[in-house]
Every structure is written in structure tokens, then in C-alpha cells.
């Protein structure tokens, strides 16, 4: 299991090839699951959310996490600490273009990154049980 966050993003502003950390990717190789905080791409500065670029670029997008999970060869990807939260009308002072998101929106974003494994959209206090090998 690899648990990742955003503090290790290699580059927090463009140009960058990915919003994820090389360190997390290295640790993820051969893991069963990645558990990582995620922001939905709809909050990006090229959208109409109003979220300042420096805040957006500190996060890892669900689509980049999907790509990382594919490259690492993991079976499961759990997205946590979601920005914006599922069903929220706003993320703090910022709007959510297109309205509140569903868990399927986060799953689709990870799939857009190329991941075809199991995607779990975590909610607060979620628990997870992996099958025994």
C-alpha cells in the first residue's frame, strides 16, 4: 500500500508533465493499492471555478493519479480528501463549474488517465478491506 499526499509534488506550477510526485510513483511500483488525495480537473485555472492557480497546482489531479496508477501497475486506486467534496455546491469561495460532482465524475477522471483497475472514491471515515493474497 502506498499513501500519497500533495506535499511532494515535484513541480507546483506549469510547465509540468504531471501533478503527481515521482517519489510516490517510485513507491507505488508493485503495490496493491495507492491511497491519495485528489482534485478534480474541473477546478483547474482553465475552467471557471475561480480557484487561484497556486492552490490548484499544489494538488494531484484524479486524471494524473489514474495515469500514475497505470504506470505503477497497481490493482486499486483510492481517491481521498476530494476537492471538491462529493455533492458540494462550492469549494470554499470557489464555484464548481457544471455543478456538484458525483463519485462517478472522479472515477471517470481517473479512467481518463488510463487506469482500468478498481477505483474507490473515498469519503470521510471510509474503511477499506483488501482481499487476502
Model region roles, listed by residue range:
Residues 1-3, 121:
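Residue-level marker for buried hydrophobic side chains located in beta-strands
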Residues 8-123:
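Cap/insert and terminal regions of metallo-dependent hydrolase folds
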Residues 121-133:
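C-terminal regions of proteins
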Amino acid at each position: 500500500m502506498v499513501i500519497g499526499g500533495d506535499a511532494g509534488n515535484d513541480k507546483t506550477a506549469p510547465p509540468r508533465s504531471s501533478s503527481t510526485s515521482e517519489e510516490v510513483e517510485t513507491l507505488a511500483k508493485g503495490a496493491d493499492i495507492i491511497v491519495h488525495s485528489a482534485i478534480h480537473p474541473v477546478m483547474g485555472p482553465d475552467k471557471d471555478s475561480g480557484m487561484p492557480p497556486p492552490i490548484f497546482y499544489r494538488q494531484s489531479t484524479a486524471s494524473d493519479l489514474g495515469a500514475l496508477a497505470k504506470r505503477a501497475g497497481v490493482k486499486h486506486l483510492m481517491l481521498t480528501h476530494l476537492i471538491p467534496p462529493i455533492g458540494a455546491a462550492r469549494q470554499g469561495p470557489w464555484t464548481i463549474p457544471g455543478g456538484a460532482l458525483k463519485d462517478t465524475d472522479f472515477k471517470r477522471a481517473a479512467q481518463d488517465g488510463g487506469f482500468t483497475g478498481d477505483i474507490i472514491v473515498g469519503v470521510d471515515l471510509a474503511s477499506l478491506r483488501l482481499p487476502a493474497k
